[in-house]
Design a protein with these regions (language model features):
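Conserved acidic carboxylate
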Residues: 8
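Two-component/phosphorelay signaling modules centered on CheY-like receiver
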Residues: 11-29
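Acidic, metal-coordinating helix/loop segments flanking the phosphotransfer/catalytic sites
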Residues: 30-48
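Acidic catalytic/metal-coordinating carboxylates
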Residues: 33-36, 59-65
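Conserved phosphotransfer cores of two-component systems
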Residues: 42-44, 66-75, 95
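Active-site residues of response regulator receiver
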Residues: 52, 81
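The feature encodes the CheY-like receiver
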Residues: 56, 85
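C-terminal output helix
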Residues: 105-114
Length: 126
C-alpha cells in the first residue's frame, strides 16, 4: 500500500483529502503544519507527499527543502496551492515539487496524477 503524507493546515481540506485518498486505497498520514509533517516524513517514509504551500510557521517551500535534506530518499512531492499562475508553477518546480495542484483539488485530477506518478491506490478511480 502506497504511503502518502498530507500536510495541510485547513482541517476541512485535510480531512476531505484524507478520506478521498483512503477511499482510493492509500495509507495516509496527515499533518497540520510543516513541523508535524517532517516528523511524519522521518517516521513513516512516505512515497508521496502532498504539501500545502501556505502553511503556518514555515511554508511548503521550506518543507520541501527540509524534506530533501532528510537521510531517507525524499518522497515525490506535490504542491497544493491556491496560486495558479505560470510563475507559481515554475517556483514549485524549482523547489523540487514533482507536480502542482490548484486548490480546491479536483478528486479525479488527484487520482489521475497519483496514477501517472506510478502510485495508484488499489481502488483508484483514475
Amino acid at each position: 500500500m502506497t504511503r502518502v503524507l498530507l500536510i495541510e493546515d485547513n482541517t476541512d481540506a485535510r480531512e476531505a483529502l484524507r478520506a478521498l485518498l483512503e477511499l482510493d486505497g492509500y495509507e495516509v498520514h496527515a499533518a497540520a503544519d510543516g513541523t508535524e509533517g517532517l516528523d511524519l516524513a522521518r517516521t513513516k517514509a512516505p512515497e508521496v507527499a502532498l504539501v500545502d504551500i501556505g502553511l503556518p510557521g514555515f511554508d511548503g517551500y521550506e518543507v520541501a527543502r527540509r524534506m530533501k535534506a532528510l537521510p531517507a530518499p525524499p518522497p515525490l512531492m506535490v504542491a497544493l496551492t491556491g496560486y495558479s499562475e505560470p510563475e507559481d508553477r515554475q517556483r514549485t518546480k524549482d523547489a523540487g515539487f514533482t507536480a502542482h495542484l490548484v486548490k480546491p483539488v479536483d478528486p479525479d485530477d488527484l487520482s489521475r496524477l497519483l496514477a501517472h506518478l506510478g502510485t495508484p491506490g488499489p481502488g483508484s478511480r483514475g
